[in-house]
Amino acid sequence: MTMSTARTAVRSLESLGRVHFIGIGGVGMSAVARIMVARGVPVTGSDAKDLPVMADLAAAGAGIHVGYSAGNLGAAEAVVAGSAIRADNPELQAARAAGLPVLHRSEALAAAMAGDRVVTVAGTHGKSTTTSMVTVLLQGAGLDPTFAIGANVPSLGVNAASGTSDIFVAEADESDGSFLNYRPHIAVVTNVEPDHLDYYGTAEAVYESFDSFTELLPADGVLVACADDPGARALAERTRTRGNTRVVTYGTAEDAQLRLHDGGPGDVWVSTGAGRFALDLQVPGRHNALNAAAAFAVALELGVAPDAASGALAHFSGASRRFEFKGEGRGVRVYDDYAHHPTEVRAALAAARSVAGDHKVHVLFQPHLFSRTREFAADFAEALNAADTALVLDIYPAREDPIPGVSSKLIGDRLSAGGRLVAAEDAVRAVVANAAAGDIVLTAGAGDVTAYGPLIVEALLAEAPGG
């Protein structure tokens, strides 16, 4: 599929009337529904399974259905359809037959944003964590933003809430071009790399979409871009040349306007024209230090005093599936990460290495999408070779059909001596056999590899003395 940069006119919540969500149990869909319910919009929704978040939405006042049926639409005046909803879904077919407006999740979220000062976080990697950090930092500084995040955040308790201020913080997903539906006042871009080429077709189209995104910023807005990332840095330079908005850069680069020093845990600080300020971070990794610097920059743009901003992340423990601690057994600590791009795998393994110290790092990786594996097989292998052992599962297909000649073997053939392919039924045993006390185990990928973390912890505990 090639990219379309057509932008939808932003609707108001009032214009939508009663809203029905098809696929309401998804992380992104439930976030929008939660905000709409809190803002007084009559909401109903359905999903194929009875997911935990649906009980929360029902308790908040939404009408919830398990299973899909045309009758679930009720008196809906607008419909929001999740990206995984098929064209033959009976509710979607009924909505179209009735002439109801059918919105993408991003269009519904844009309607919820209308009238607020909007902060969006975009980028190939780090969106969920950075959006979470911005939200936690603003809350810690005494503000109460509305927020919508594409991951569950233990520090916040939920992935979305309607706040009392006029600030709206949201993750902006570039994977299908839908981030062009937002109208941000502050736009953070953590990095820009070719990805989602199944949608965009070419790397150039990816870069063009980010240019279109920054063109949405008003004259009194600001682009906050990472000076350490070549793609984000080039975007900042093009935006400055275009001159439609201000640009603020952050990072360890000498010319970054907000300069980051990352000396490891306990030695992270940023310097601005107002001085030098320590960042109290509990999450490891250079990538998280950069994410924190971006959040700090946003806080300053919103008028938060630097001293108030610097300590506000002390209790941030990370977002779900972002180097998330799953447990420990036999002295081996197990973490899980959503990393599904070579850059993300490198960052997650670097964080694991910083935690492991002199001990070993073992990774169980599940490639995500045939198209991504074909495009980045060599880069994945290079990234995985940073681990002491790397076990690679079969590709998680998600929305794709198989591509002839594309399998995990494309990665496996390029792994160093510590790496090999592993069958799903052998994965837990193989990981446990590799790990010794003090080591770190990382499960990585955007598919169901996340289910292996608890199983590995359970197996390690069974082998522990008294287990």
Curated annotation (Swiss-Prot):
**What pathway is this protein a component of?**
Cell wall biogenesis; peptidoglycan biosynthesis
Q: Which InterPro entries match?
A: Mur-like_cat_sf (IPR036565), Mur_ligase_C (IPR004101), Mur_ligase_C_dom_sf (IPR036615), Mur_ligase_cen (IPR013221), Mur_ligase_N (IPR000713), MurCDEF_pg_biosynth (IPR050061), UDP-N-AcMur_Ala_ligase_MurC (IPR005758)
The UniProt keywords, alphabetically, are: ATP-binding, Cell cycle, Cell division, Cell shape, Cell wall biogenesis/degradation, Cytoplasm, Ligase, Nucleotide-binding, Peptidoglycan synthesis
| Pfam families xref list | Mur_ligase (PF01225), Mur_ligase_C (PF02875), Mur_ligase_M (PF08245)
Q: Where in or outside the cell?
A: Cytoplasm
GO MF terms here are: ATP binding; UDP-N-acetylmuramate-L-alanine ligase activity
Q: Does the keyword Cell cycle apply?
A: yes
Where would you find the membrane-spanning parts of this chain?
none
Q: Where does ATP bind?
A: G123, T124, H125, G126, K127, S128, T129
Family, according to the entry, reads as follows: Belongs to the MurCDEF family.
Q: What is this protein called?
A: UDP-N-acetylmuramate--L-alanine ligase
- Name of the coding gene: murC
